[in-house]
């Protein structure tokens, strides 16, 4: 079989004139060899990150840990729940430990789908944070390696320089800003492989690498993969433009191949992807609102200036892209434009792609499209890693022709770059830019230009070592200055052992229960410590449940809801039977102390409603739960149930930004702030001062137990806003009344597992069996062995209609879309395998055909030794024409077969 050599994506001059073939000794030192480029691209970023961790005192080098933003609040708890399920044999389809009960298959797909995450099974529970940290460092190193490997495929020979560019890809401004976002990193490290796979698909008609790597990227994180897929469409068009013109059939075939393998890659991930898509439709992000008017956030000059190193990264609500990838890009980009060895068509295409990204960073509508037809809630320009990839590749192309670059071009590039930096100091007004960064950038530019001059003067022995040192220093300084913020590991894990002991003491449980920590570290403490809980902070949060929480006076937002603001009545409805306190509190008629472990206290709520109970059929019509005041909503449910109001008006006086009231009797007090412009409130209590943040989210402010006769004063931080508020005292007697009314026909569970519930209910009369299970179409309910239709109660919960009498109820859960997605994935795998075998068979047939031709020619020569064999005249072709000829003949052979 004839071996087809690797084809460079970018059309170059004949092999003999290749720049890399004229500099085999470039950057070779006793310490560094050209083949070391790949090792450098992996190990230097890893060592840089380890050094930064040592300097920051990150465990085991100190008491700190690398838990930043979502890694603190979401990733660590979800990793803990994932590990817990793997070790205990729990279902990966549903979890009661997160937000009242969630579709864990969707949560897994969104946060945990990286295949590397399964290694957590080998990690001790107490080192989950360190497992995540190690995975981040490993993925950063692999990102550098994959990009260097991609560049190596374009240089034909091992050259040390691929390692330098790999370092900047791994330690770019994007990584500095988002390296903590472990669920994105798989897509970053796979991206160079995907792009190379697409190039092979277009050049060599081989789609296996493209399909598998893109499928793995989509599986690992669908969100970043949306941006990858959008770019692949653009890059596919770019590759066709850079191809040598051919017949229309050639372009049609390429488009068909691209479409088939792209669909197959999505199909490979469908088993994970479809349940996630269905779940996301029930989130607040499920809405679609394309911008009505187009606008620009900032000028292109300011964006380009963010290539300067040591500039503070942007992860907030501003839209600035994090695009730093070494200040040398200023030099190399100008050298790229000036290089006569690089085709004008190529320059036009790649510069066009860069302009598209600049427009996407700055124009609101394009920003909306790139982020999956949504505006990002902080963490801007999440597609900027693609821009960095393009910019570094462009610069590498200039680097490949450094031998042919005149010294005057280097001088012009340096002075042009230096002038831009000085101009940026004058024009850029962002607070991210400290004045010193401009001068540091010029120093590094001068150092890079000096190295180029040394190289051009023939002093190449030390150039490789000096270049590596300079690149490592620049990248590490930027990473150290702009990245790796830390928090206290001790404070995050301080009470873990105590909580574990107390929650384990509740097992085995005879009936369903939920637990809440009154002093939480995150809204996902249940997932972190593996106990059934109520609160949740996740992008997969159910929007209807968030709205219902707010109606009852609990804290909620776009992607979170929590028990903050709940009354004992709300706790009872949500089956919160146990509470964990960080300090001892007195027993009441409603709550009883159970046990304590090293300063953590476990209490039982004595009047907790079961997971399900029968309500009258007309309660949804009678209960006015759409009112603005959550206290009135709770009281109305009491009245509808035939009980007294649980929240009694305690009066109070409003005076500008203050609200005061005096308790008339001992009890637990709450305040509801009606002015939504007030965000922060300070309460002066007999026990001291208490602060409340995010008050505009509409939750009840819990003031605790207050004695009569002592004035309580609340003050809004917003001095110009009037603190319109109402104070309430919680009535324990009314609570017992309403509990007795609602608990007349409870559901008693006989079995309780992740995806299956069984129980009995004795309904005094026909009604609605309400459950505090969030509504999900994945639930199937059977009554007395017969499947019944489920419905959404109060806009958020799972319910069914039951007749009077005794019934056996069975619940089972299977995520919507999982079966269909699994079938699609299985079918895609089969098709991909068939395509692989088909291609191998075609190549074998072609090889056999050629061998047969050779044997025939040999036989003819033996039969008539005097006759000279005739050979087909082969035209004189250059590398590019030869490549096209081979590819066209292979395509023709495939069509015939």
Regions found by a protein language model. Name each.
Residues 1-58, 253, 257, 457-467, ...:
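Start-transfer (signal-anchor) and selected internal transmembrane alpha helices
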Residues 55-155, 159-192, 216-220, 311-319:
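Active-site lumenal/periplasmic loops and adjacent helix-entry segments of GT-C-fold
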Residues 205, 224, 348-368, 374-498, ...:
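Contiguous transmembrane helix-bundle modules in multi-pass membrane proteins
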């Amino acid at each position: 079989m004839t071996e087809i050599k690797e084809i460079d994506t970018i059309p170059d001059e004949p092999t003999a004139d290749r720049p890399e073939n004229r500099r085999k000794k470039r950057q070779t030192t006793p310490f560094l060899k050209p083949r070391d480029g790949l090792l450098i691209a992996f190990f230097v970023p890893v060592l840089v990150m380890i050094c930064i961790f040592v300097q920051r005192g990150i465990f085991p080098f100190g008491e700190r840990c690398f838990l930043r933003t979502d890694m603190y609040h979401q990733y660590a708890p979800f990793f803990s729940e994932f590990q817990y399920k793997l070790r205990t044999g729990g279902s990966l389809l549903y979890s009661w430990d997160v937000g009242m009960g969630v579709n864990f298959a969707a949560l897994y797909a969104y946060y945990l789908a990286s295949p590397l995450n399964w290694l957590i099974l080998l990690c001790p529970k107490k080192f989950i944070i360190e497992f995540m940290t190690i995975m981040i460092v490993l993925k950063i190193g692999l990102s550098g390696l994959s990009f260097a490997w991609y560049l190596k495929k374009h240089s034909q020979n091992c050259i040390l320089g691929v390692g330098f560019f790999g370092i900047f890809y791994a330690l770019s401004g994007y990584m500095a800003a988002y390296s903590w976002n472990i669920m994105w990193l798989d897509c970053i490290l796979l991206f160079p492989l995907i792009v190379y796979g697409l190039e092979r698909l277009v050049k060599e008609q081989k789609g296996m690498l493209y399909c598998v790597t893109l499928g793995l990227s989509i599986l690992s994180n669908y969100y970043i993969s949306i941006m990858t897929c959008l770019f692949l469409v653009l890059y596919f068009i770019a590759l066709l433009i850079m191809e040598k013109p051919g017949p229309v059939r050639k372009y049609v075939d390429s488009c068909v191949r691209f479409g088939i393998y792209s669909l197959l890659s999505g199909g490979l991930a469908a088993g994970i992807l479809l349940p996630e898509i269905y779940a996301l439709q029930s989130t607040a992000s499920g809405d679609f609102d394309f911008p009505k008017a187009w606008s620009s956030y900032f000028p292109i000059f300011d964006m380009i200036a963010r290539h300067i190193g040591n500039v503070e990264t942007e992860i907030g609500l501003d839209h600035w892209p994090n695009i730093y990838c070494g200040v040398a890009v200023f030099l190399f980009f100008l050298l790229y434009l000036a290089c006569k060895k690089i085709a004008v068509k190529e320059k036009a295409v790649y510069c066009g792609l860069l302009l598209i990204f600049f427009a996407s960073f700055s124009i609101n509508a394009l920003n909306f499209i790139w982020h999956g037809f949504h505006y990002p809630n902080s963490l801007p320009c999440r597609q900027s890693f693609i821009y960095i990839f393009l910019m570094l590749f462009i610069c590498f192309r200039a680097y490949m022709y450094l031998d042919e670059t005149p010294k005057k071009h280097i001088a012009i590039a340096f002075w042009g770059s230096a002038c831009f930096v000085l101009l940026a100091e004058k024009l850029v007004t962002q607070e991210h830019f400290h004045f010193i960064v401009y001068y540091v950038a010029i120093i590094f530019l001068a150092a890079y230009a000096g190295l180029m001059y040394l190289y051009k003067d023939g002093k190449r022995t030390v150039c490789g070592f000096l270049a590596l040192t300079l690149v490592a220093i620049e990248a590490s300084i930027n990473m150290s200055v702009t990245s790796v913020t830390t928090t206290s590991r001790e404070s995050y894990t301080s009470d873990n052992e105590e909580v574990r002991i107390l929650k384990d003491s509740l097992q085995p449980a005879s009936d369903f229960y939920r637990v809440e920590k009154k002093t939480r570290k995150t809204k996902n403490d249940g997932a972190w410590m593996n106990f059934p809980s109520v609160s949740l902070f996740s992008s997969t949060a159910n929007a209807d449940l968030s709205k219902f929480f707010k109606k009852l006076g609990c804290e909620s937002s776009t992607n979170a809801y929590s028990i903050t603001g709940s009354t004992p009545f709300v706790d009872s409805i949500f089956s919160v039977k146990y509470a964990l306190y960080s300090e001892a509190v007195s027993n009441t008629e409603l709550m009883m102390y159970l046990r304590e472990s090293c300063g953590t206290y476990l209490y039982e709520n004595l009047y907790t409603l079961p997971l399900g109970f029968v309500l009258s059929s007309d309660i949804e019509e009678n209960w006015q739960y759409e009112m603005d005041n959550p206290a009135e909503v709770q009281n109305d449910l009491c009245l509808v149930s035939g009980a007294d109001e649980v929240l009694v008006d305690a009066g109070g006086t409003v005076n500008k930004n203050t609200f005061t009231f005096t308790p008339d009797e001992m009890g637990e007090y709450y305040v509801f702030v009606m002015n939504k412009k007030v965000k922060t409130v300070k309460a002066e209590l007999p026990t001291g001062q208490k602060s409340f943040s995010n008050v505009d989210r509409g939750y009840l402010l819990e003031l605790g137990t207050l004695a009569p006769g002592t004035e309580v004063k609340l003050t809004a931080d917003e001095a110009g806003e009037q603190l319109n508020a109402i104070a309430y005292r919680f009535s324990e007697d009314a609570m017992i009344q309403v509990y007795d009314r609602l608990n007349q026909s409870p559901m008693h569970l006989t079995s309780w597992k992740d995806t299956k519930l069984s129980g009995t209910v004795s309904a005094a009369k026909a009604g609605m069996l309400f459950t505090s299970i969030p509504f999900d179409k994945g639930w199937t309910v059977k009554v007395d062995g017969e499947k019944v239709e489920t419905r959404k109660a109060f806009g958020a919960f799972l319910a069914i209609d039951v007749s009077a009498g005794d019934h056996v109820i069975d619940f089972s859960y299977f995520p919507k879309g999982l079966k269909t997605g699994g079938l699609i994935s299985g079918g895609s795998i089969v098709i991909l395998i068939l395509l692989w075998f088909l291609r191998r068979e075609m190549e074998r047939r072609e090889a056999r055909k050629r061998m047969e031709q050779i044997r025939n020619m040999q036989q003819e020569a033996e039969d008539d030794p005097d006759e000279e064999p005739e050979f087909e005249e082969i035209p004189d072709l250059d590398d590019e024409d030869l490549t096209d000829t081979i590819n066209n003949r292979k395509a023709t052979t495939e069509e015939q077969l």
